[in-house]
């Protein structure tokens, strides 16, 4: 092995784990990855070098690359995202490369154990788990843990190793090779869509602990100053910087803001109950600005069951709610404690048409508690809620009765849906995790594969905005409803949902449009870079310049290990600074590998899909009319033209030019892309 070169932010080495042979070896980070910052960039480089483009997800040749970034473990705020890159089984019409981003403490623990990355290859003949503790690393027998749910599996591994270790495991869904499955870490943090790859390799989990120092270049006082400045820019979740109700301490407020920690709110299940004070602007009260249970379950019952917040290593906000619901536990035989956030905290109710939009009802809360505990324990992935919306549309339209065998249809307790009985979810997710029947098997395959099997046109979904379905097997993730043309183009560029909040963190920050336009002028040269939501104007170069910046920031965050729910900090709660943040607080895109997989140079035609529902309006209001988020097709195509020119990609095909690769130091891909006819004009 080459000499280990430690650098600030890097341990200088990683691990290669061959499950076929059982051999684990150290590999140097440098010089091989000298041009890759970390995270996804490192993962994509491994796949470019080592994995043939047509590799299938469950092939032995497929690999898993676990890679945090140079910020991980350093104490830099919000720096605990680990990128896990592999060939995804849920992407349509063919599996393609993508990354999951898992929070918790895995990133920090891997660095503290002394490693920048883990490359996992091959397949084990028997269930194993990977144990890492500094220089002690080995594959251990997991026979007694295989078959267990994620909660019990994590506890068993903690008992065998250390309660202080970072533990990530798969559940029965992954073991049964369900494509819609996850890796679960730190009890509730998940990496979506990658579970079946672990299952196919018989890798039950990864346990990491260590006590190696993390070296940073900055002087201690300088580091403290930077950290304090970063804290000063913090708002609430998704960088919402104004409160959700009028407050004399603030100039502005917005009813949809996630800064919902208001004076007098009581977290009632804390011991003793926590009563929020008048001023949440103090850096020592950042974690009180946000309460997920209140936001997603409704204020009365959310606060009633709120214990405290929790979250990832080195994050002061703590976006997860820990709740205690004794009523749901007694009725449905689940754990009284639940820890979750965002869609995972509420999507259980989406299955039930009567309560899907009624978050304040106890039945909705019960469905949420039962749904997330059951899904997480079985290791089923929701694909950003797409699984639930698929089931619901099939149910509401009477399609299940048409496509399922009569015996299977009659075995399903449909009346529980009408009764809003959350135990239906326990039945449903069990069927998915164990691939039981036609419904269980195909709901677990992702949307277009399910539709194709049942003879339903994909366009029936992509033309129906209620499904949120976008294309390639994934749903929208903050599209035109949040950022007009910028959101549309962004959602077309990735193989799965983009998992990017650089758009919505700005447009829904809570600031009035006049202030946002001033900030847009500061960072992107024109106030025309942003419109008021629901009052969109035709596309322009300024919007696409902002999109270019957003994508570069997203890629940078995925390489550094930063959380995109909080970064970038272009807005702040500070009136004295005109609410302007600092975009230097924290890229490379992965287009080339995707083109090799598809053997396709015309990415614009055959990859960058947008759904038909973005061109519809329930009241048939024209695009660019105040009050509608309807888009205009010619305007969207023009947006692509502008964007591709800005980033030096060929507008006709949406493929990077030879010069574009040179501009970002990817010269090494040019000979291969030329040979395979994947550089436009060559």
Language-model segments: residues:
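Extended C-terminal regions of large enzymes
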Residues: 59, 79-87, 158-192, 198-682
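Protein-protein interaction/assembly regions in multi-subunit complexes
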Residues: 1-195, 200-239, 260-262, 266-285, ...
């Amino acid at each position: 092995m080459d000499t280990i070169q430690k650098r600030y932010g890097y341990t200088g080495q990683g691990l290669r784990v061959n499950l076929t042979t059982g051999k684990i070896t150290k590999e140097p980070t440098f010089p091989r990855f000298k041009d890759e910052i970390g995270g996804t960039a490192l993962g994509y480089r491994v796949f470019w070098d080592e994995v043939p483009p047509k590799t299938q997800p469950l092939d032995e040749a497929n690999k898993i690359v676990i890679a945090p970034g140079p910020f991980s473990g350093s104490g830099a705020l919000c720096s605990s995202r680990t990128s896990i890159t592999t060939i995804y089984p849920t992407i349509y019409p063919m599996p393609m490369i993508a990354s999951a981003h898992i929070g918790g403490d895995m990133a920090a623990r891997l660095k503290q154990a002394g490693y920048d990355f883990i490359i996992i290859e091959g397949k084990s003949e028997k269930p194993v788990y990977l144990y890492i503790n500094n220089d002690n690393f080995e594959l251990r027998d997991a026979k007694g843990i295989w078959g267990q749910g994620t909660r019990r599996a994590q506890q068993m591994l903690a008992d065998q190793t250390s309660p202080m270790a970072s533990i990530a495991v798969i559940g029965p869904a992954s073991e049964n090779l369900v494509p819609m499955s996850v890796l679960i870490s730190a009890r509730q943090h998940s990496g979506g869509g990658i579970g079946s790859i672990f299952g196919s390799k018989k890798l039950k989990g990864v346990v990491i602990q260590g006590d190696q120092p993390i070296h940073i270049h900055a002087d201690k006082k300088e580091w403290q100053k930077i950290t304090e400045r970063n804290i000063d820019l913090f708002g609430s979740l998704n960088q919402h910087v104004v409160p959700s109700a009028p407050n004399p301490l603030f100039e502005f407020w917005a009813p949809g803001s996630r800064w919902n920690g208001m004076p007098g709110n009581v977290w009632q299940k804390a011991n003793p109950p926590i009563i929020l004070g008048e001023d949440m602007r103090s850096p020592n009260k950042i974690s009180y600005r946000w309460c997920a249970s209140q936001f997603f379950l409704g204020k009365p019952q959310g606060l009633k069951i709120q214990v405290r917040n929790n979250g990832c290593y080195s994050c002061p906000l703590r976006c997860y709610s820990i709740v205690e619901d004794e009523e749901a536990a007694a009725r449905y035989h689940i754990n009284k404690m639940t820890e979750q956030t965002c869609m995972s905290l509420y999507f259980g109710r989406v299955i039930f048409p009567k309560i899907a939009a009624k978050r304040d009802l106890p039945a909705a809360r019960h469905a949420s508690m039962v749904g997330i505990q059951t899904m997480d324990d079985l290791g089923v992935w929701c694909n950003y809620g797409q699984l639930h919306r698929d089931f619901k549309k099939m149910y509401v339209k009477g399609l299940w009765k048409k496509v399922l065998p009569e015996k299977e249809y009659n075995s399903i307790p449909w009346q529980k849906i009408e009764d809003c009985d959350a135990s239906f979810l326990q039945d449903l997710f069990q069927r998915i995790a164990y691939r039981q029947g036609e419904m269980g098997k195909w709901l677990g395959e992702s949307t277009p594969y399910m539709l194709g099997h049942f003879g339903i046109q994909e366009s029936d979904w992509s033309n129906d905005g209620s499904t949120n379905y976008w294309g390639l097997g994934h749903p929208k993730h903050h599209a035109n409803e949040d950022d007009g043309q910028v959101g549309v183009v962004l959602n077309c560029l990735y193989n799965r949902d983009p998992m990017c909040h650089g758009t919505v963190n700005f447009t829904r920050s809570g600031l009035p449009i006049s202030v946002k336009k001033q900030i847009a002028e500061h960072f992107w040269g024109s106030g025309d870079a942003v419109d008021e939501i629901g009052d969109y104007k035709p596309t322009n170069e300024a919007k696409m310049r902002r999109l270019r910046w957003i994508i570069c920031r997203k890629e940078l965050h995925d390489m550094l290990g930063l959380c995109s729910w909080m970064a970038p900090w272009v807005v702040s709660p500070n009136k004295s600074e005109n609410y302007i943040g600092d975009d230097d607080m924290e890229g490379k895109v992965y287009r080339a590998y995707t083109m090799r997989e598809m053997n396709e140079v015309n990415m614009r035609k055959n990859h960058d899909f947008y759904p038909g529902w973005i061109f519809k309006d329930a009241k048939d209001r024209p695009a660019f009319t105040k009050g509608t988020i309807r888009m205009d097709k010619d305007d969207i195509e023009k947006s692509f033209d502008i964007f591709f020119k800005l980033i030096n990609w060929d507008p006709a095909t949406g493929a990077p030019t030879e010069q574009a690769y040179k501009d970002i130091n990817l010269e090494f891909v040019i000979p291969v892309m030329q040979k395979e006819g994947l550089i436009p004009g060559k």
